[in-house]
Amino acid sequence: MTGRFIVLDGIDGCGKSTQIRHLAQWLPASGLMPSTAQLICTREPGGTPLGQSIRELLLHTEADQVPSVTAELLLYAADRAQHVDTVIRPALLRGDWVLSDRFAGSTLAYQGYGRGLDRQLITRLESIATTGLEPDLTAWLMVPVEVSLQRRHGEKEDRIEAEGRAFLRRVADGFAVLAEQRNWSQIDAQQSVSKLSQVLEQTLRETLQ
């Protein structure tokens, strides 16, 4: 595969979506990508038509249809398998670049550390869903839990976002462990939007050039 796979990850409210939009404009003009490559911007869950249906089940489910924690884990794995098989891997094989809002690390952080599910089981499911595909760069956007909650104050929450402070703190701790284990780029996301954009641009240049 000749394309590149870039992931932004972190707890809710870390600024991923804003920076994805920035990088979607910056990357094609940066000189990093071959002139023949396209940039595919995507997300998890919901990066495919099937995945969008799974996203609705995961995040916006009616009270009488909430999945169990095991069913939730398997739905995330199904979303990822479809995403890798039909979007990410084909794009990389074409030589295109893929920029994703979340990937496998989020499942370990949220379902493993947040929910307390067996992390070895999650890792095995990750291997099945991704068939060994790993990002060329994962940037973890670091913000304290209090900052995340403050940024999202007053916004409508999905089912996962509504889990509360203690859950989010466990997830944040999980991301910190994973970032060390998997050698992710760790980026202070408390900076201004423009400064954070500059740091991400430099990180991409240093890693992918």
From Swiss-Prot:
GO CC, one annotated term: cytosol
Protein keywords: ATP-binding, Kinase, Nucleotide biosynthesis, Nucleotide-binding, Transferase
PROSITE patterns, A to Z: THYMIDYLATE_KINASE
Pfam families (alphabetical): Thymidylate_kin
Gene Ontology terms describing biological process: dTDP biosynthetic process; dTTP biosynthetic process; dUDP biosynthetic process
Record keyword Transport present: no
Protein residues bound to ATP: 10-17
Keyword Phosphoprotein: no
Residues spanning the signal sequence: none
Highest taxon of the lineage: Bacteria
Catalytic activity field: dTMP + ATP = dTDP + ADP
Molecular-function GO terms, alphabetical: ATP binding; dTMP kinase activity
EC class name: transferase
EC code(s) of this entry: 2.7.4.9
Described purpose of this protein according to its UniProt entry: Phosphorylation of dTMP to form dTDP in both de novo and salvage pathways of dTTP synthesis.
Family the entry assigns: Belongs to the thymidylate kinase family.
Name by which UniProt lists this protein: Thymidylate kinase
Gene source species: Synechococcus sp. (strain CC9902)
Highest classification ranks of the organism: Bacteria, Bacillati, Cyanobacteriota, Cyanophyceae, Synechococcales
Name of the coding gene: tmk
